[in-house]
């Protein structure tokens, strides 16, 4: 980390001049980890270009390696190569560690639950605290069995795949034939009824993404019945688009989902989009410092839901343009930001970014429908309010139609130590506040290793050029 680091804190340097920069951000975590799953389940050699290398993706890669997959990694060129085995998992037993990666935890649990092997899934205390019960219940409905080592409905667990149902444990030993997640390597029987599963996705759409991607492993197909009011979302659309790119289709009827029978993931070369979640911090930096920031290789039409944050910045008065290098955000003329009233349920990772810049808007900003973020890497609502209040910013929660939101009033942020709660997004979002306020210090800044390990180095480079 660069010049702002002192021990276990990072002292944010207030920008002396408007930030004007063109920055490169890493590949998308959401896209990288979905691509890793599909490549492992494909038949043959797949190359992933522009991959993210961070704690989350390394835990996903490490888990695949622990399961016996041949994975070649080139962190310099941001490339991962995987030999897929048509749904076969090389090792019939084993232990994986998903760290704090929600995508790895949810996606790999579904993969292993549809196998005929027995596996242990470990995680950090942070991930152990996050909900998994809805996914465990759905996979149990499909025939998997779970043994909990701690609290029921949470990691760590031992999973016994649906292919072991009614089969003695000795038949899931390493001495037997290679495990296969595809229960049949044929095309499936058109006369077979699809398997059926029910899932509540109100707390995380990763549960549905896991079932969609793993559903390809069921030869007769899978009908996914949604039991929650929420039935769709930006990350679900990412999953569906990526499955289509890898040769598999999912039908959505406006409420439920159907994964067709006899599908397989294709191999080839797949390019990982830049991480728009990471890009948003730098676009927000332009907004609060009166500057202009372009994020290289970003473009309109990208599938990541956080692209909607650009619409929020427009409502605040910023100008957004597509350039040859990438999307450029310019602060409003005169530097005055407008308050906004916005539902961020579909791109809630940016609710923290908006909360961090909202004090600079000339009025009260209201962020609707984000109650589910209490159950993520931290209680993100409480963490945001704690840090805003530490800066002497008036803020609080409200409920509308039974859904929780946050309001943030205009104010001048006072010097404060930002508690990250080991949450990468808290560290990066409030670093943006510090670009336009004095005395902002980020505690435990390296929690950003989860998704953007050199974030503060990039930030320092930007500041050094302005």
Where in the sequence are the language-model features?
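Structural preference for solvent-exposed beta-strand-turn elements
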Residues: 1-466
